[in-house]
């Protein structure tokens, strides 16, 4: 009997995002049957699968309570999940950046304002001397409720901060000019090994690089020193993830981490030859 795995997705992409569909034939070549399954579909019999791989679950941040319950249910049934639930829970709250900084990872400076403390956002930015800064919910994805603001704040900006702070804890970071000048680098790793790199660029008049906001993605060849710095981020974790996307900027010769994506990142397989096969081999190795 062949191995059967679920590639978890969400309701708006029941057949997976286009990039993730590349995994199905790559896994089939290794004798592994893979099919999309909507994570929130209560009719799905997850115990019928040998493992679940989180892929296009791009609504988890706005349904986080349900998502946590789904993770717990898979755990209770001892269904192998990658990335594993403890790592997913840790990565879901962007305060993980503070944890990684404490482990010696070079990150973009990050401050936290607690839920409902909108006034703390302005105080933090002012105290750090940031005349332009970015806010986002600690639990968010795809540029959700992410804004670039300037000091001194006007009434509209304060209203925006109040709305974001009402959702939960808020990340406050200095605006990275490097995003506008060059873009954001993304390094994809499968089972701890570097696969490929891409660069995401924002459209004119926008700072968010996600394609949902008009951003573009291109493949890029990066120097070994940058790959090594991105790899050090992955090595800083307590467990080696099946997949990881390390996002950040370069400042001089240094790579600064902006996000470590371990839940449902687009790993841009279509931008690198044989990337889908590398991912498939990593999955096969985990399955044993």
Residue ranges and their predicted role:
Residues 1-82, 87, 95, 119, ...:
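ATP-binding N-terminal substructure of ATP-dependent carboxylate-amine bond-forming enzymes
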Residues 2-9, 15, 71-76, 85-182, ...:
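Active-site nucleotide/adenylate-binding loops and adjacent lid/helix of ATP-dependent enzymes
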Residues 144-234, 238, 249:
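Phosphate-binding site of ATP-dependent enzymes
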């Amino acid at each position: 009997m062949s191995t059967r795995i679920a590639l978890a997705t969400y309701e708006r992409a029941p057949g997976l995002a286009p990039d993730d569909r590349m995994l199905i034939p790559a896994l089939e070549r290794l004798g592994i049957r893979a099919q999309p399954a909507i994570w929130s579909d209560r009719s799905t019999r997850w115990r019928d699968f040998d493992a679940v791989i989180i892929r296009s679950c791009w609504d988890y941040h706005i349904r986080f309570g349900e998502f946590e319950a789904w993770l717990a249910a898979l755990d209770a049934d001892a269904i192998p999940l990658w990335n594993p639930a403890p790592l997913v829970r840790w990565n879901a709250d962007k305060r993980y950046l503070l944890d990684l900084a404490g482990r010696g990872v070079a990150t973009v400076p990050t401050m936290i304002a607690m839920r409902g403390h909108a006034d703390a956002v302005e105080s933090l930015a002012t105290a750090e001397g940031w005349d332009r800064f970015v806010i986002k919910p600690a639990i968010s994805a795809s540029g959700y409720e992410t804004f670039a603001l300037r000091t001194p704040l006007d009434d509209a900006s304060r209203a925006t901060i109040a709305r974001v702070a009402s959702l939960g804890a808020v990340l406050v970071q200095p605006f990275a000019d490097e995003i506008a000048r060059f873009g954001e680098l993304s390094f994809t790793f499968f089972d701890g090994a570097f696969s490929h790199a891409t660069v995401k660029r924002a459209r004119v008049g926008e700072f968010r690089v996600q394609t949902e906001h008009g951003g573009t993605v291109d493949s890029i060849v990066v120097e070994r020193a940058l790959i090594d710095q991105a790899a050090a981020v992955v090595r800083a974790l307590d467990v080696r993830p099946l997949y990881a996307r390390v996002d950040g900027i370069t400042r001089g010769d240094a790579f600064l981490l902006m996000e470590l994506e371990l839940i449902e990142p687009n790993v841009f397989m279509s931008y690198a030859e044989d990337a889908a096969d590398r991912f498939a081999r990593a999955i096969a190795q985990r399955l044993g």
